[in-house]
């Protein structure tokens, strides 16, 4: 199956670190939605979306990319990094509109100095770590 992960990694590189490890270990293509806001995804069997979580939402670049580029009736999975907790609803709304099949969700801690976390020097330092990277690779490798 041909797989792509569309990602946005804009602060500490947490998401980029994760998806690059996945691409290294699994046969997937990567699209940086910040650098390439338009892409034809019709040839892909599985499409992943990945970003950090900002105030309980996927990054706006990912939400816009999914709204504008995602074909209907595709198998889709989500990967997020977060300081607080994972949140998928913002993207799930778009995926539902596109009549997709959600085949999985994965999230892990990521170093976060966004907003108020900056005042305390950040949270989840050192993440994603090796354990997180291995778990992400296992998640993608196990997708049907």
Predicted regions mapped to residue ranges:
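FMN-binding flavodoxin-like domain, especially the glycine-rich phosphate-binding loop
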Residues: 3-6, 10, 16-17, 24-29, ...
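A short beta-strand-loop structural module common to alpha/beta enzyme folds
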Residues: 27-38
